[in-house]
Amino acid sequence: MPTESGSCSTARQAKQKRKSHSLSIRRTNSSEQERTGLPREMLEGQDSKLPSSVRSTLLELFGQIEREFENLYIENLELRREIDTLNERLAGEGQAIDGAELSKGQLKTKASHSTSQLSQKLKTTYKASTSKIVSSFKTTTSRAICQLVKEYIGHRDGIWDVSVTRTQPIVLGTASADHTALLWSIETGKCLVKYAGHVGSVNSIKFHPSEQLALTASGDQTAHIWRYVVQLPTPQPVADTSQQISGEDEIECSDKDEPDIDGDVSSDCPTVRVPLTSLKSHQGVVIAADWLVGGKQVVTASWDRTANLYDVETSELVHSLTGHDQELTHCCTHPTQRLVVTSSRDTTFRLWDFRDPSIHSVNVFQGHTDTVTSAVFTVGDNVVSGSDDRTVKVWDLKNMRSPIATIRTDSAINRINVCVGQKIIALPHDNRQVRLFDMSGVRLARLPRSSRQGHRRMVCCSAWSEDHPICNLFTCGFDRQAIGWNINIPALLQEK
């Protein structure tokens, strides 16, 4: 049609006009310019409308790009010569690689193995010279085995905390927003004891170091100490739900609903409704509680911005620890010394020292830029802190001015836990992932998560259990389930 032909003609004219006024820059190096003797303006293009300063800058940039390509080309030639030398050496030993000659842009398939070996050797040499820099976003080359063993399903709401008993028999404890705490058989996944003494969300659970006593903290502004008696059922063969995964080799799963719960699985197990002791001094939610070494005192952390130290036998308040500017999020005690660390939304964590009975000292640490979700002790002289600022930091108690290692991740971190023997940190994330790092900040593995296994909602807490032969790591989340894992980290991965 006339309209179409006219429009096409107009478009062609406009295109030719733009082309005639386009910048024409001929890139050349200094040697070519010296050989031709042409003036700079002729090399740049007579019809350029750009100012001379802009043209000069462009020429300089193009020159830099050209030099980079020249360097790459030279390196490529050197690599090819190395490969030729390697092939000649192999041929002299009777191990010549067929088709190892190089084409202009590629190598033959069978020569790629030699190239890979050479490339790996170069990478190893480079890494050895730069090993002082730790990047938490780089995975290691060895394989860590992370196997899902058991799922513990029975809570009616999200699970905030998970813990393992320190006395025989070894059982798993979970604290849930459904106002209950449950004890589980690790081997069978059966509920053994249900604690229903709280009238609010149960936010944490910790076990006495030598007796069958549990300590729970709740949104009802109290902490309870209660006794449990468990009788383990006969273990059944564990179904093989394993998926041996290393690093990042798992398949991401889509958002799915929480696991279906047929009936109340905790209705058949014995229920404890009355605590031995109820600690009631807080004016807000009690978010966490823990036993001091020896088990004669406990510490609680609350949204009223205080942490309280209680005597277990008398239930009396011994100390009220004040100083945080916002709500507390967690508390943890040292396994062998009278030390307490408290975490807060004020971006700090505080170290409280009760080793001297006459006075207690406090140190404030400001290493994070967002809520400190947890800070925990290791057996040695380290504290590990995790935060909503997506970092985990490792501190030395002898010099806590700055962290000795920093782990940067892609999601907020919740209640962390450190494996005593292997010194591995388990990081539960808001984004449903669980990652494992060593104390130097090197990532060891990420727990598998697919359409068939793993957490489907935020992971709230992690807990190691080195003494159990089947599961040595437990995680829980807001998908209303706890998961038992078997983690096998090769010794090679832990070598420094």
UniProtKB/Swiss-Prot annotation:
Q: Which PROSITE patterns match?
A: WD_REPEATS_1, WD_REPEATS_2, WD_REPEATS_REGION
Disordered: annotated span: 1-50, 238-267
**Superkingdom, natural source:** Eukaryota
Q: Biological process (GO) annotations?
A: corpus callosum development; lymphocyte homeostasis
Locations listed in the record: Cytoplasm; Nucleus
Biased region (Basic and acidic residues) positions are 32-47
Q: Effect of gene disruption?
A: Mice lacking WDR37 have reduced absolute numbers of circulating T and B lymphocytes.
Any one GO cellular component localisation term in the record: nucleus
Provide the residue intervals of the WD repeats.
Answer: 154-194, 197-236, 281-320, 323-362, 367-405, 408-447, 454-495
Going by the UniProt record, its keywords in alphabetical order are: Cytoplasm, Nucleus, Repeat, WD repeat
State whether keyword Nucleus applies: yes
**Purpose:** Required for normal ER Ca2+ handling in lymphocytes. Together with PACS1, it plays an essential role in stabilizing peripheral lymphocyte populations.
Task: Show the PANTHER family listed in the entry.
Answer: WD REPEAT-CONTAINING PROTEIN 37, WD40 REPEAT PROTEIN 12, 37
Relate the assembly described in the record.
Answer: Forms homodimers. Interacts with PACS1. Interacts with PACS2.
Name-wise, this protein is WD repeat-containing protein 37
Q: Say which species the protein is native to.
A: Mus musculus (Mouse)
The taxonomic lineage of its organism, from the top, reads:
Eukaryota, Metazoa, Chordata, Craniata, Vertebrata
